[in-house]
Amino acid sequence: MMDWYAIQTYSGSEQSVKKAIENLANDHDIRDRIQEIIVPTEDIIEVSKKSKTKVMERSLYPGYVFIKVDLDTVLWHKIQSLPRVSRFIGENKKPTPLSEADIGHILEKMNNRAAPKPKIFFEQGEVVRVVEGPFANFTATVEEYDVEHRKLKLNVSIFGRTTPIEILYSQVEKII
């Protein structure tokens, strides 16, 4: 019976583990027992200091690969022994199938890919520090954010008066 399982991998090795499982299936002629292998990802926008943007792919569940497989002890041990595979998720060192609700949530999250999100998120009311431009080293409060244009509308307090400014994401940093 085909069930979904979660495999824990070394973080950052999800794609190489997926490829290794695909190769294992092809080499041992067990493709009919492995129905699907997924590494859920999302697109993010990374903005460099020079305001150059690039879309990058980021794992939604770092360190995990999900597999729909007809699993027996032999196949479990073959997958378990692949490089960069830590373990199957389960109880008492035995793999436990994921519930329909869990895998449904994962697949829904994966299929509802929206426009790429910025790597750094700002929220209304959040206090940030301006790191570039005429207001460098000032702290400001986020009033609005424009994801599409990667701009923020901030309120900066200058000489006791609140002044609205518009600034690029790359010109501010979060205060931790």
From Swiss-Prot:
Keywords assigned by UniProt, alphabetized: Transcription, Transcription antitermination, Transcription regulation, Transcription termination
PANTHER family assigned: RHO-INTERACTING TRANSCRIPTION TERMINATION FACTOR NUSG (PTHR30265), TRANSCRIPTION TERMINATION_ANTITERMINATION PROTEIN NUSG (PTHR30265:SF2)
GO biological process: DNA-templated transcription termination; regulation of DNA-templated transcription elongation; transcription antitermination; transcription elongation-coupled chromatin remodeling
Designated gene of the protein: nusG
Function: Participates in transcription elongation, termination and antitermination.
Protein name: Transcription termination/antitermination protein NusG
Gene Ontology terms: cellular component: cytosol
Family of this protein: Belongs to the NusG family.
Keyword Electron transport: no
Residue ranges of every copy of the KOW domain listed in the record: 125-149
